[in-house]
């Protein structure tokens, strides 16, 4: 059966059957006619791949393709995988341009991402509405935890714009939980009357959430994820909220963040101006303020370090919850990363 499957795909121009591609497959479905495969598709994590339909069935070509894609998408939805990608191949390169194109956002020459703009519209509608304003800035942060550096970045945006949206990433992969991070950001900017702090939801996406094990290089993972993030932000979120600029912090120590910032600049400018703000230095000889350094200090119980890097409100939270935070680390919570 596997040999027949591979032979069918090879006849459709798909020839990569390395173990690294096959081993992650969760499910493969096939459509038969007269005991011969006429269509197939597979799923690996969040990626739909190995999709092909027999060219000789052109009369039912679009119907069969859409049936396959619907079955695969439904399977992923049942599994809770709503951020769905399709890996382009010799077949899908042709078909996705003509069929179901309204459902898919082109990321690059290798990947498409499934659109669900109704969910995205619902997300935007939950944000506080404002009357039309000329200068609306945006800041996207993880705030793990909220530092003086984050505060400095938001202050810059606040001084130079009439309104600032601060999107806090919604991913439970951090030492500080999402509700804690949002609360810390709100407490840290409560004196800035033109700043609105919101949960970024599912569509303000960190590149860390991308299934990088499907990609060959880390730089590629950053590029793919940032492209999705930026294009959704530019064409759907920013347009809905009237956002005219985005503020990001420079990262002299992080190759990945530098790549991320470069992608933002190339994709957003000139319609949405990207401001790269130089990182704020900590007091003493600690160098640039870094949330990672704060997390490492929490792990070591080094209060002198985190006090120089975080706001007073964040200091109080860490002091009151130090044992709980350290316990999370002892249980395996990773503290590296951005």
From Swiss-Prot:
GO terms for molecular function: [citrate (pro-3S)-lyase] ligase activity; ATP binding. It catalyses: holo-[citrate lyase ACP] + acetate + ATP = acetyl-[citrate lyase ACP] + AMP + diphosphate. GO terms for biological process: biosynthetic process. The keyword Ligase applies. The keyword Cell inner membrane does not apply. Keywords: ATP-binding, Ligase, Nucleotide-binding. It is an enzyme of class 6 (ligase). Its EC number is 6.2.1.22. InterPro entries: Citrate_lyase_ligase (IPR005216), Citrate_lyase_ligase_C (IPR013166), Cyt_trans-like (IPR004821), Rossmann-like_a/b/a_fold (IPR014729). PANTHER family: [CITRATE [PRO-3S]-LYASE] LIGASE. Acetylation of prosthetic group (2-(5''-phosphoribosyl)-3'-dephosphocoenzyme-A) of the gamma subunit of citrate lyase. This is [Citrate [pro-3S]-lyase] ligase. The lineage of its organism: Bacteria, Bacillati, Bacillota, Bacilli, Lactobacillales. The gene is citC.
């Amino acid at each position: 059966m596997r040999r027949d499957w591979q032979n069918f795909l090879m006849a459709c121009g798909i020839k990569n059957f390395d173990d690294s591609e096959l081993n992650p497959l969760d499910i493969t479905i096939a459509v038969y006619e007269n005991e011969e495969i006429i269509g197939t598709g597979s799923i690996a994590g969040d990626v739909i791949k190995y999709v092909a339909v027999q060219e000789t069935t052109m009369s039912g070509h679009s119907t069969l393709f859409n049936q396959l894609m619907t079955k695969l998408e439904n399977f992923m939805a049942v599994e809770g995988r709503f951020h769905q990608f399709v890996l382009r191949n010799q077949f899908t390169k042709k078909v996705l341009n003509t069929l179901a194109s309204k459902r898919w956002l082109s990321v690059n020459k290798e990947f498409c991402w499934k659109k669900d703009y109704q969910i995205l519209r619902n997300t935007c509608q939950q944000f506080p509405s404002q009357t039309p304003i000329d200068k609306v800035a945006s800041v996207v942060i993880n705030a793990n935890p909220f530092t003086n550096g984050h505060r400095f970045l938001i202050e810059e945006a606040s001084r130079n714009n009439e309104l600032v949206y601060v999107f806090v990433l919604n991913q439970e992969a951090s030492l500080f939980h999402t509700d804690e991070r949002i609360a810390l950001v709100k407490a840290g900017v409560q004196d800035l009357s033109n700043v609105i702090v919101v949960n970024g939801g599912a569509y303000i996406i960190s590149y860390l959430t991308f299934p990088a094990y499907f990609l060959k290089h880390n730089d590629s993972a950053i590029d793919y994820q940032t492209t999705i993030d930026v294009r959704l932000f530019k064409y759907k979120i920013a347009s809905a909220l009237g956002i005219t600029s985005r503020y990001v912090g420079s990262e002299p120590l992080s190759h990945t963040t530098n790549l991320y910032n470069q992608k933002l600049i190339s994709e957003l400018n000139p319609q949405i101006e990207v401001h790269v703000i130089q990182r704020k230095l900590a007091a003493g000889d600690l160098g640039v303020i870094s949330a990672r350094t704060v997390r490492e200090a929490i792990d070591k119980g080094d209060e002198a370090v985190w006090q120089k890097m975080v706001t007073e409100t964040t200091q109080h939270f860490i002091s009151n919850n130090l044992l709980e935070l350290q316990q999370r680390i002892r249980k395996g919570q990773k503290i590296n990363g951005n």
